[in-house]
Design a protein with these regions (language model features):
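Oligomerization/assembly interface segments of phage tail-like spikes and tubes
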Residues: 46-60, 101-112
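Generic "edge-of-domain/loop-turn" microfeature
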Residues: 38-40, 61, 112-114
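Small/polar-rich, solvent-exposed N-terminal microdomains that initiate assembly or binding
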Residues: 1-44, 68-72, 80
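Short, solvent-exposed beta-strand/turn "edge" segments of beta-rich domains on protein surfaces
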Residues: 41-47, 96-98
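A generic structural signal for ordered secondary structure
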Residues: 14, 18, 28, 55-60, ...
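Short, charged, low-hydrophobicity "junction" segments
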Residues: 3-9, 55-57, 86
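Acidic-leaning, charged glycine-interspersed low-complexity segments
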Residues: 71-117
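Short, conserved charged micro-motifs
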Residues: 61-68, 116
Length: 117
């Protein structure tokens, strides 16, 4: 799923990074994809829940534009259509090292275990 999501977000006009790709000062808004793991479901032995987090970063001194960018990311994920929202609104925090505002958007999907169908 990671590769499909990465490509879809990039095609949607977003700057996207994965683990270890971005460690510099934030000069442009971007999304960091983090695969948050897989867990068993209580409702079915055949399903597992895969979680993914999107960390949304926006440069300092442009706070008034952060919410619009977050909405752009959320709308792009809706168009992707393979993930379900798994969060209430998280606070917008400050990353002084990257000189950016950031927040987290969590999503998940249910997938069949191998041999589970």
């Amino acid at each position: 799923m990671f590769q499909d999501l990465y490509r879809f977000l990039r095609t949607g006009g977003l700057k996207v990074y994965s683990l270890g790709q971005q460690d510099k000062i934030c000069t442009d808004p971007f999304v960091f994809i983090y695969e948050a793991g897989t867990e068993d479901t209580s409702s079915s032995k055949n399903l597992k829940k895969e979680s993914i987090e999107l960390w949304v970063f926006y440069p300092f001194n442009e706070y008034s534009k952060v919410e619009d960018y977050i909405k752009q990311v959320e709308n792009t994920i809706k168009k992707f259509g393979k993930l379900r929202k798994n969060y209430d609104k998280y606070a917008i925090e400050i990353d002084n090292d990257m000189k950016a505002y950031y927040t987290k958007l969590s999503y998940f999907r249910y997938v069949y275990r191998e041999g589970g169908r």
